[in-house]
Amino acid sequence: MENKIEVNNKDEMNRWFEEFKKGNGLVDTFTNSYSFCESVPNLDRFVFQMASATDDAQKDSIYASALVEATKFCAPIYECAWVSSTGIVKKGLEWFEKNAGTIKSWDESYTELKVDVPKIEQLTGYQQAALKWRKDIGFRVNANTAALSNKVLAEYKVPGEIVMSVKEMLSDMIRRRNLILNRGGDENPRGPVSHEHVDWCREFVKGKYIMAFNPPWGDINKSGRSGIALVATGLAKLAETEGKGIFDEAKKTVEALNGYLDKHKDEVDRASADSMITNLLKHIAKAQELYKNSSALRAQSAQIDTAFSSYYWLYKAGVTPETFPTVSQFLFELGKQPRGTKKMKKALLSTPMKWGKKLYELFADDSFQQNRIYMHPAVLTAGRISEMGVCFGTIPVANPDDAAQGSGHTKSILNLRTNTETNNPCAKTIVKLFEVQKTGFNIQDMDIVASEHLLHQSLVGKQSPFQNAYNVKGNATSANII
């Protein structure tokens, strides 16, 4: 078996794709990037099947079947070919050999991360490594393989018949988000921060230093119920939505304020001025500490970079460019026929290739005690095999034309369009998957609701499985559904 996607750069990729497209009748009516999707998947029968299911194993199987049906033909073929091409496979795997130091903070602790929640440094270390990997190997070939830095969508337009369902999903996502933000593990518990405080901080970091003389709450050093200065909690909250760069802006504003006070020293009480500058810098430092320990940052940093994690798992399993086609074929077959966790683990252990057992050994421990939403994004689970699937299993690289048979992997849904001209097939499909889940399970009792996670990915602006959203600013659950 050999990798037939012999591509090392964008020009070669374009030539390969044009040839492939001619012979395979790809379309982009319902998808952002060309795919085999000729119609929006109909999942109604799975709702009916779920209604009569009697046990969890049966329900899991029905949902797995619905997922495959929903995603079988909608993967972005150009980008999937790029991710599996000979050039990216070679560079993607070699990078890990050369960058042991870059991944050390979490790679060395992999065994512990299989059973326990990561430290915030291990999450941010992962995200920095993912961005470095993308840059170093030249992963970006177009916007669909980019690292995003936009703001979350302010508006999300959906067909009238699913507005209420999307709002129901958002409501549950907000409930979960609040549970996370208010969990007991924060080192710095703090109550809700008012819009007024955040708005003041936003103006202050823009350089309006005179505002420090008279904040709306009175004294610049006033504390809230938590005993923490309101300036600090306001800045920390602002950083959660606008990024940590606001701390540097805040320091610049304080420098400008100090310059103003120096310039007018004859009209200034020096002791009061020095005290104000010292305290403002102290409040900024406290805000940085709050931000670093915040659950919002933890949630943001726990997002999986699908391509980076998938390559990391290949590397850990000892896959080489020569054995890569066997992994690709295995994942392609996995996406054709839905399998439960047990069957999938059995399939991994049954393959004669060494990587099968090694991938199995990478799986998170069943004794992982916490909510699985906190799990490190580099830890492999049965569910996350689908991340590898969308990368390497959409097109079996030894026989690329077989991709026309379809292979379903969850994140392919992000390739479905969200525009109103096509009636937002992405949201419609996600809502139908939610309906399937809701019919069989008590949504409130679930750690992770897969369909809600997909909606969240769509709201942060992802239009492809291969985009990194770590630097996307804002809160996705604030989107206005219209």
Curated annotation (Swiss-Prot):
Mutation effect (residue 453 to A): Loss of DNA endonuclease activity
Residues at the site labelled Cleavage by host CASP3/caspase 3: 269-270
Keyword Amino-acid biosynthesis: no
Gene3D superfamilies for the chain: 1.20.58.1110
EC number: 3.1.-.-
Enzyme class, spelled out: hydrolase
Cofactor note: Endonuclease activity is stimulated by divalent cations such as Mn2+, Co2+, and Mg2+.
Keyword Manganese: no
Annotated effect of mutating residue 374 to A: Slight loss of DNA endonuclease activity
Result, substituting residue 457 to A: Almost complete loss of DNA endonuclease activity
Compartment list: Virion
Keywords: Capsid protein, Helical capsid protein, Hydrolase, Ribonucleoprotein, RNA-binding, Viral nucleoprotein, Virion
Family, as annotated: Belongs to the nairovirus nucleocapsid protein family.
Record comment regarding domains: The DEVD motif is a CASP3/caspase 3 cleavage site essential for viral replication in host cell. However, the importance for viral replication is apprently not linked to caspase cleavage. This motif is involved in homooligomerization.
Function statement: Binds dsRNA and ssRNA and probably participates in the packaging of viral genome. In the dsRNA binding mode, the nucleocapsid protein specifically binds to the vRNA panhandle secondary structure formed at the termini of viral genome. Does not discriminate between viral and nonviral RNAs through ssRNA binding mode. Displays dsDNA endonuclease activity that is sequence non-specific.
Description of how the protein assembles with itself and partners: Probable homooligomer; forms a double superhelical polymer. Monomer.
Name listed for the protein in its UniProt record: Nucleoprotein
Taxonomic classification: Viruses, Riboviria, Orthornavirae, Negarnaviricota, Polyploviricotina
Name of the coding gene: N
